[in-house]
């Protein structure tokens, strides 16, 4: 049709058009232009994250004619920077969104620039649609720019070729002269009509982004996303805007989604204004642009300048900014005028209200009437969310994960995510690519995370829908795939520590508070799939439970609701971190007993042959230890909620955990581990300054975890200790062996965790390659050790390990022939070698044939158009576009898809059909690859036991290597301890130093000689001034014993020990307010445990016992305890005290040696110089006044204190009868004697009185 005819026809329809223009333009503002910047004429990543996965019906026929298309919302045409530059418009209505902060900007990369979706009025100001169009078509680009690259939201068939009417067989793109002409009824298909605003809906489109191109470096996208269903989120590489001449492609505006309220949900701010460019005088293809923009303009006035006044816009029926806002808010209120009643009156699944004792905050009751009113997407969401009300649910919508309702409020309030504040279904969103980061952030704050993923692609759904006979709901299928908690993380990227993270279930059996409780314990490290179980009877102070919790330090706890005692809860709180997660679950229905566990094992496919194929430990516990099995049942149930039960249980990795291991290891209870700062320091609970931090120099993560176990249980057998020392000495003295070990260890990934992911079938191809490469290094290293060092290592523990390690050479060689390792590592896909997988080969061949057909078609087009420069161009999901020079005419039935100043890109029906066949073939090929990946993992997992054994042997070598490295770091002097097997205990250290302090202050630390047992007394009573180093000396002796029995060198010139059976410590002064126990009560309780459990080969450390009560009572208790230790038990140890008279009482005892920490005192200036030297004798005073002076107390206060101290000393001397034992003068013990009806006090029966005290 000519330009003149168009004008005449437009005049005839002018009146009718004016009547409808107000209605049709309302819909314009529900569409937001997608403004993006792309790399010029190269890989156009502007379409990479292009299409939204809207929840609109999946079976909508998009292949209808133009008239049908025009009745539905179309994508609008965004404008490039040049379209806005230098146009004569009102300064108050800016065409560009203002710079602002990015609420979704990920802290993972501070340099990453992300553009911001804006609401319509933010990006358009007060401009009318007509003004936007006119200003966008009246400018000339300075360089080759994208002037027409709409990316289709609809299917290929939706691009009806009838809109390209022409009389000639070939034509140029529509002339820009049509912009000033009137349109006839014939040309109305070029201008899509707009619908009025739809009700909020959660139906979704079946479009998918699987074939989007990844963003390329050099592209900076300025995206404006239309609504919360939009899945376009672009993460461009950071580049300088001045470094590229890439223009912003003209893109379609996404069709209106039915569940939006007019606000942009995924709003991401533009970092900086777009540089202005010179305007151009005329634009080509303006009529086509009008069609693409999708706005129906009744009578656009021809404007040369491209400017328009607000008044003129209003005359043309365009709403001003306030009117638009009002219309939008009215529509919003209409659909969201009241909140769901069941969200106001919250009840759990059993309809218990908040505050009810039986209220379960994990569930939500939704009445049947509400289900009937839900849209398909709402129904899908609430079906999952109603059982996860205590969990933040990340719901996948295309390229976003979205959080709704209370979860959205958390995201907004805690993490400042952009909130779409609806009355119902308020929402925040994050990009799909940043899920791991945001999930880690939520977990770090203590939240549980649920992940709901799309279980099918849009194209896959379309293929399935064609095969179904029954009509399905038009919503993409989604399902709960993961629930993440801090104690059950399995993804290596989310794990913040190389050490094990445990989730523990505790079952208690207790008849009354005064009885000894029994416990069943089961805990798991989900990153490796290892279960640990035990059952024991404890004392009323929960000593064994305290020891186990201190060793394991669980991150998450599962307890039986209303079935665990308050004493046990207090004991648990004392041992675990304040950040640990507590889960109280229902008895019987969730905290299963052994009968229920047995039924579930039989019913489920967890082990081969059901219960018969279960691990031996589990089967024996089922018949013998019901409490432990009940704890396992609770953990079993919990893992099922997290979708981890099959992955974890099917590994069969069960063992029995013995916290004390009394027959084989040095026993250290929880109190000792805390007092000696073995794993956590007393400052901030961290590992800095601890013995573990000093000694653990393992290279591999699985080596560190094994070393932690070694340190929890140092050896007791002299033979085993010497075997370890031999290996450590061999590695330390042989640099070649040391270098060989380090050479293969430092390149290994965390194989123990990675093979558990392979077993679960959740490993990425790149990680699977890392696993295979890691085992190749290990296998090669063991081969080298066998060939080169077997003669040296023979007869040692290292030689046994080298000989015992399985040789997996043949299996690994088979894997090298299975698939392309490089492609799997770099591209994340398994490409099997030809002939390895027939199904894959057939699918690959079919795809190649389809691609060949496409290129044959391209050659045909080259001949048809007589142009040899034609080629294919991929723009996002619109792949294989035929790129044609702009001066070449194309057939009339070719549909233009995008273009630049020099080239245009087209589709036609023939090309679309072939492309669709190729895309469907690729979709089916993905399913084949998924099945093939599963086969690979099953085959690898068939040798799980051999792989795990290889890891354990490697971890042991890593621990030996760590001990040799730690010895070298101790500083001189250090020595190999001499281990002496004899009946009586014996310790000898010459020039002993504290290893942790010595590591940072080697030149200033004062060493000391320590001798206990043998020909010397078993017990040293230690006196000395405050701050003289008594507590440090006590700790360094204990640590030296632990190091020696661990198999490590010790920081001494010479060391000789008899292996100890246990170490007990009573240090410091603390009360226990929660248990209503005073400082003195805590002291006596801990002392009572020591007296009950220590033996002749125990090392006991008591620091200032009796400080928590009066002088006489404290002295009496100290005397009685010390007498019992040296006379009845005969253990080795130190007893530090400030009771000088106590030394006098034991001056002639043959098993007591009186020693002091030396100090030089200047009485004139009240100055004490601490010498930190251990020497024989009794310190005459504690020099408290001198320490008070050093602390800065006022002189008047100190003078008064000295005067009072002198009076008290004289009064005590006159009162005490030198012939009486001071212990017998204690009022405390006299009261006890009367209350217990015990005979008159003697040194023999004082321990009996103390033992009766609780």
Swiss-Prot record:
Query: What are the annotated GO cellular component locations?
Result: cytosol; MutSalpha complex; nucleus
Where do the segments described as Disordered lie? 1-324
Q: Which InterPro entries match?
A: DNA_mismatch_repair_MutS-lik_N, DNA_mismatch_repair_MutS/MSH, DNA_mismatch_repair_MutS_C, DNA_mismatch_repair_MutS_clamp, DNA_mismatch_repair_MutS_core, DNA_mismatch_repair_MutS_N, DNA_mismatch_repair_MutS_sf, DNA_mmatch_repair_MutS_con_dom
Which ranges are annotated Polar residues under compositional bias? 79-90
Where does this protein have compositionally biased stretches of type Low complexity?
A: 62-72, 102-114, 295-313
Query: Tell me, how does this one assemble?
Result: Heterodimer of msh2 and msh6.
Q: Which family does it belong to?
A: Belongs to the DNA mismatch repair MutS family.
Q: Any idea where this protein resides?
A: Nucleus
Q: Where is the composition biased (Basic and acidic residues)?
A: 8-18
Q: Which residues carry this modification: Phosphoserine?
A: 205, 299, 307, 309
Q: Which stretches are tagged as biased composition: Acidic residues?
A: 204-213, 251-262
The disulfide bonds in this chain are none
Q: Where does ATP bind?
A: 1024-1031
- Quote the NCBIfam families the UniProt record gives: PRK05399.1
- SUPFAM superfamilies xrefs: DNA repair protein MutS, domain I, DNA repair protein MutS, domain II, DNA repair protein MutS, domain III, P-loop containing nucleoside triphosphate hydrolases
* Keyword entries, A-Z: ATP-binding, DNA damage, DNA repair, DNA-binding, Nucleotide-binding, Nucleus, Phosphoprotein
Record GO terms (molecular function)? ATP binding; ATP hydrolysis activity; ATP-dependent DNA damage sensor activity; guanine/thymine mispair binding; mismatched DNA binding
Outline what the protein does. Answer: Involved in post-replicative DNA-mismatch repair. Has a role towards base-base mispairs and insertion-deletion loops.
Q: Which CDD domains match?
A: ABC_MSH6_euk
Gene3D superfamilies named in the record: 1.10.1420.10, DNA repair protein MutS, domain I, MutS, connector domain, P-loop containing nucleotide triphosphate hydrolases
One of the GO biological process terms: mismatch repair
Pfam families hit by this protein: MutS_I (PF01624), MutS_II (PF05188), MutS_III (PF05192), MutS_IV (PF05190), MutS_V (PF00488)
Q: Can you name the source organism? A: Schizosaccharomyces pombe (strain 972 / ATCC 24843) (Fission yeast)
Protein name according to UniProt: DNA mismatch repair protein msh6
The highest taxon in the source lineage is Eukaryota
